[in-house]
Amino acid sequence: RADNLKPHVMVAAWPWPSYMDPEARDRGIRVRTSSYTRHHVNITMCKAKANGNYINSILALREALDAGCEEALLLDNEGYVAEGSGENVFLVRDGTIYTPELTSCLEGITRDSIFRIAADLGYQVKERRITRDEVYIADEAFFTGTAAEVVPIRELDSRPIGSGSRGPLTEKLQSIYFDTVRGRAAQYAEWLTPVS
C-alpha cells in the first residue's frame, strides 16, 4: 500500500541544450491549443512540480508536435487559458502585460522574474482569467519557463499573433532576462548563485 513508503531522493545533472530551436527565440514559435485540458485544481497537487503531473503536458506537447507546431497551449476545465505544456504564458495588449492567475498553472520562477523585470521597466502585469480569443488578438504573446526561458509566440492555431513575429516588448524582456541569467545584469545579481 502507499501508506508506508519511504521517500528516496535522486538528483541528476546533465548538459541541457536549448529547449527550443535557437532561432525560435528570434522568430517565435507556432502553438496549437491542445485538446487535452490542464488538470483541475482538485485532481492533484497542481502546485507541485511533480513528475506524475507531467503526463498531461507530454500528451499535449506530442499532439502539438504531430500537428507541425512547436508547443501546446492548455486550457483549464472552464475553457480559460492555463499554460503551455511546460511554460507559463503571457500576452501583451495595448501596452499592458497579462498572464493567467495561478489557479490552473504552476507558479514559475521565470514567471516571477518577468513580473519583476516588467515592473522595473514601468509595465504593469495583470493576473486574470484569459480567453483563447484574447490570445488571438493580442499584440504579442510569449512563454516563460526554466527550460524555455522567454520565447515569443508568433502564431496560435494558425492565426498570427500581432505582426506574426517577436514583438518589441517581448524582445526587451527577453534581452534583459538573458543578460540576467548570464550574469550581465547587476540589478538582478541576487538571483544567481555562481558555480565553478
Regions found by a protein language model. Give the residues of each.
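Helix-start/capping segments and mature chain N-termini
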Residues: 1-196
